[in-house]
């Protein structure tokens, strides 16, 4: 098989901390071009953000069309002196390849490329349909000039995707324990309570917003938003900070703010969720407390790839290699799958995610071989 470990090493050695590409997309483009893929390098820009390089590569012109998606950008390594091996060395020690991005998610991309090249080598260089790669350099930061725009660009060209595999590190403990088939949506906001500033010795001349915001935090936090659904855990609203902008101990503040985030399931849409929280806030305020919510824009909506032939195919490929039947899960944070879901069914399956974003991020060499075999099994079944 094509050596996914070598590709992983070459990618890790590109210090592609967002927004830098540092040659990572070039590594992939060279491999895919050599195998007969038509490749496109697209740079997206937006005022106030860094320009980001993206890569789209496709071989085949007919359906069915499966695309592998991913990101080559990584988070900063942190204190490099704390690493056992240099953060961008890609060195192997004791059965693990070390480096920022080994797990999240250069290893996953390397495995998908290796599997695709092996499949093509065994089928005279052409799939029984189409294989493509959607690779961005803007996932770990603002995600503005990355996958969301790359998908729009592809759609404008007439590209149609039937299914997608996103190689995020989905497994919790061992290879084959989990496929992500959906994600909860994310909505942030700021609760603002108005008072009247005054001297602490004359409280009758002031209105203290601190007790009021405390009551509202309890009111909005205590009652569940829902009790979950068939595929999703219950939604949760979490307050993350409270601030009055006041450093003086003898002044009653005039305003109090509390930031919060909601992770919501398919019991809600973004609009219905906001309406529910606003309704509860109005009830808690009554006629006395003056408060409102400033909602932040969000492109992170809930999505679900319903279990069916595509998930069955992936489960079969995983089980045939690992002997494990993976859980179909919707837990965890957001990913670029939230954008892809608007274009085609998407699943997330990659390496074990235990060390992602940590000092000494590393991937098991054996797991990289296993993932490559699983991706090859998915392709074999997809084009059977």
Swiss-Prot record:
Pathway the protein takes part in: Amino-acid biosynthesis; L-lysine biosynthesis via DAP pathway; LL-2,6-diaminopimelate from (S)-tetrahydrodipicolinate (succinylase route): step 3/3
Cofactor(s) required for function per UniProt: Zn(2+); Co(2+)
Binding positions for Zn(2+) 1 per the UniProt entry: 71, 104, 168
Enzyme class: hydrolase
Keyword DNA-binding: no
Cofactor note: Binds 2 Zn(2+) or Co(2+) ions per subunit.
Record: active site: 73, 139 (proton acceptor)
GO biological process, one term: lysine biosynthetic process via diaminopimelate
Catalytic activity reported: N-succinyl-(2S,6S)-2,6-diaminopimelate + H2O = (2S,6S)-2,6-diaminopimelate + succinate
One Pfam family, short name: M20_dimer
Gene3D superfamilies membership: Zn peptidases
Signal as UniProt keyword: no
The entry's keywords: Amino-acid biosynthesis, Cobalt, Diaminopimelate biosynthesis, Hydrolase, Lysine biosynthesis, Metal-binding, Zinc
SUPFAM superfamilies membership: Bacterial exopeptidase dimerisation domain, Zn-dependent exopeptidases
E.C. number(s) listed in UniProt: 3.5.1.18
Positions contributing to Zn(2+) 2 binding: 104, 140, 357
Description of how the protein assembles with itself and partners: Homodimer.
Family: Belongs to the peptidase M20A family. DapE subfamily.
Xref: PANTHER family: ACETYLORNITHINE DEACETYLASE (PTHR43808), N-ACETYL-L-CITRULLINE DEACETYLASE (PTHR43808:SF31)
Function: Catalyzes the hydrolysis of N-succinyl-L,L-diaminopimelic acid (SDAP), forming succinate and LL-2,6-diaminopimelate (DAP), an intermediate involved in the bacterial biosynthesis of lysine and meso-diaminopimelic acid, an essential component of bacterial cell walls.
Protein name: Succinyl-diaminopimelate desuccinylase
């Amino acid at each position: 098989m094509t050596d996914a470990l070598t590709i992983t090493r070459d990618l890790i050695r590109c210090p592609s901390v967002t927004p830098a590409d540092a040659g990572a997309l070039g590594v992939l483009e060279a491999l895919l071009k050599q195998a007969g893929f038509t490749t496109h390098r697209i740079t997206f820009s937006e005022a106030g953000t860094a320009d980001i390089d993206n890569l789209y590569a496709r071989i085949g012109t007919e359906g069915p069309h499966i695309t592998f998606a991913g990101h080559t950008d990584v988070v900063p390594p942190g204190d490099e002196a704390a690493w056992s091996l240099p953060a961008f060395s890609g060195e192997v020690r004791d059965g693990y390849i070390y480096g920022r991005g080994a797990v999240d998610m250069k290893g996953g991309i390397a495995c998908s490329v290796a599997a695709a090249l092996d499949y093509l080598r065994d089928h005279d260089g052409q799939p029984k349909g189409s294989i493509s790669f959607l690779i961005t350099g803007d996932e770990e930061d603002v995600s503005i000039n990355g996958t969301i725009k790359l998908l729009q660009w592809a759609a404008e060209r007439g590209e149609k995707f039937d299914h997608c595999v996103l190689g995020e590190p989905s497994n919790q403990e061992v290879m084959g324990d989990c496929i992500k088939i959906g994600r909860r949506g994310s909505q942030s906001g700021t609760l603002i309570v108005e008072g009247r500033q005054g001297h602490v010795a004359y409280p009758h001349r002031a209105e203290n917003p601190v007790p009021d915001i405390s009551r509202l935090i309890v009111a909005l936090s205590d009652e569940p938003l829902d009790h979950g659904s068939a595929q999703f855990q219950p939604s949760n609203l979490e307050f993350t900070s409270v601030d009055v902008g006041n450093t003086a101990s003898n002044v009653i503040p005039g305003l109090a703010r509390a930031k919060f985030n909601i992770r919501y399931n398919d019991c809600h849409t973004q609009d219905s969720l906001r309406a529910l929280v606003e309704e509860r806030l109005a009830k808690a305020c009554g006629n006395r407390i003056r408060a409102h919510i400033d909602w932040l824009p969000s492109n992170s909506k809930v999505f679900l790839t319903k279990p069916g032939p595509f998930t069955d195919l992936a489960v079969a490929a995983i089980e045939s290699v690992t002997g494990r039947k993976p859980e179909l899960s919707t837990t965890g944070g957001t990913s670029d799958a939230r954008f892809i879901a608007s274009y085609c069914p998407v699943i997330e399956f990659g390496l074990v995610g235990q060390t992602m974003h940590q000092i000494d991020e590393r991937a098991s060499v054996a797991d990289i071989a296993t993932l490559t075999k699983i991706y090859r099994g998915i392709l074999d079944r997809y084009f059977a």
